[in-house]
Structure formats: structure tokens, C-alpha cells
Amino acid sequence: MPQPDAALEPIVGRYINIESLGRKYRIFYEESGEGIPLICLHTAGTDSRQFRHVLNDPEITSKCRVIAFDMPLHGRSNPPDNWWLEKYELTTKVYTNLIHDFWLALGVENPIVMGCSMGGAVTLQVAADYQEEITGIIGLESTAFAEGRDNNFLHHPAIHGGEL
């Protein structure tokens, strides 16, 4: 017997196969809504589920086509084809090209690109590289520059001799 309060969410998930900088990727993404395309970039170590509340917000999805994808090696996205044959580094150039090639593969025009933390920081480079192709950027908990993530205090001789 079906549950009387059960309701399907409007989010639809799919895979798309794209090529970026000569490498092939199988990328998972979720989308919901109609209107202005809003590309959502997750933080390092997470995936598109980070934006599940945005994808389910009727006030947002009534105005925007919200699209959140999993970076390669995150969530349900595979690493690039033959990734073990050469060193794989997710550099700024690789990431910004992948974002651009992703929205082109979907046929998206003039998106707003929104990212959180690392995803937010890369929105600045997306804006610099593709300013004629985007509507705008939104950086959440992002920064244009951050000092190294090393905590020099941990290298003090009184604290484990700098060993973790």
C-alpha cells in the first residue's frame, strides 16, 4: 500500500559523456527547474548533493534551471578515461575548461555559475576566462586568494616534532 504522504522530488539525475582538453569524462549531474541556467559547483571532497535544497526550492526553481554536477573522482562522476596512464591533476585550467565544456555539452547559454569554497574560488577564473558567455557568478564561502593551508604551529618542536 502506497504511503499517503509520499512525494517525488523534482530533481532528475543523468550522466553525460564529454571531452575536455583531450580527455573523456563521464559526468553525473542533477537538475531541476526552468529558466536562467544556474550551474552549481560543489566544495572539494563533496558532490552535487550539497545543493539538494537549492534543487528542491520552488522559489528558486520557478526562475532558474538549477544544474549541479559531480567533479571527476567525486560523487557519481568517474575519473577521466585512462586516468592511471598519466598523472591526473585537477588544476584551475583543467577545472575551468571542464566546467565550460560541461555547460556547452548541455546546450546551456549564458549561465550563472555559483560555487562554494573551492568551487566559489574557481568562479572568479570562470568569469575571467568566459566573461562574454556567462550572466554572472556567485561565490559562496570563497576567496580570491588564501595563504597555504599549512598550519605552522604543528611544526613547533614541542608538538610531535612536526609529525602528524
Regions found by a protein language model. Name each.
Residues 115, 119, 123:
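Gly/Ala-rich beta-loop-alpha elbow adjacent to hydrolase catalytic centers
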Residues 77, 117, 141:
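Catalytic nucleophile serine of serine hydrolases
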Residues 21-22, 68-114:
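Active-site loop/oxyanion-hole signature of alpha/beta-hydrolase fold enzymes
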Residues 1-17:
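An N-terminal hydrophobic leader/cap segment in hydrolases
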Residues 52, 100, 124-128:
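Short, hydrophobic alpha-helix immediately C-terminal to the catalytic nucleophile
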Residues 37, 65, 109-112, 133-136:
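Structural signature of beta-strand start/N-cap positions in the alpha/beta core
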Residues 124-129, 134-164:
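Flexible "cap/lid" loop of the alpha/beta hydrolase fold
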Residues 21, 25-79:
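Conserved HGGG/HGGXW glycine-rich cap/lid loop of the alpha/beta-hydrolase fold
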